[in-house]
């Protein structure tokens, strides 16, 4: 099982070891679902965690709220991506939608050059895409080179156990072309069971250890 620990800045990072987690998603402001951490935080986190053989996926999100970004915000995201790459990030986590809750392909294409080939993860903005469009969205993300999607299986704050069928559907459709990582209510106590129920061995959360 691959466990990704969702961390707010540096506070808990010294307590982690590679026996507990494979990867850290590094954020600021978890109270709003996570935003881009500072350059200094990213750099120090990467140095600390790389010594522990733990990889770092850095959140690129300029604010809380929706996932529809204007030109100014996209330029800020572009700069943040460049700095996150420079600071040593192993992957970048982002999510961009249109006002109709479809993938914002124009915005993705605008940001891609700045990522410099780093692995890309689409975060839980994915859950806001209508269910009947999610398979198409997976295909598009694969075409853009995304390696992983983080999903709760629903945009609602429902128990993740209520979303098992939708998560299974995504895992089956993805068929190992892109990783499906489950989150939002995954804990150290239930991760093994959820992995078996959904068919993915990749789990994410603040309480997975």
Swiss-Prot record:
<keyword id="KW-0963">Cytoplasm</keyword>
<dbReference type="GO" id="GO:0005507">
    <property type="term" value="F:copper ion binding"/>
</dbReference>
<dbReference type="Pfam" id="PF03932">
    <property type="entry name" value="CutC"/>
</dbReference>
<protein>
    <recommendedName>
        <fullName>PF03932 family protein CutC</fullName>
    </recommendedName>
</protein>
<dbReference type="GO" id="GO:0005737">
    <property type="term" value="C:cytoplasm"/>
</dbReference>
<comment type="similarity">
    <text>Belongs to the CutC family.</text>
</comment>
<dbReference type="InterPro" id="IPR005627">
    <property type="entry name" value="CutC-like"/>
</dbReference>
<dbReference type="InterPro" id="IPR036822">
    <property type="entry name" value="CutC-like_dom_sf"/>
</dbReference>
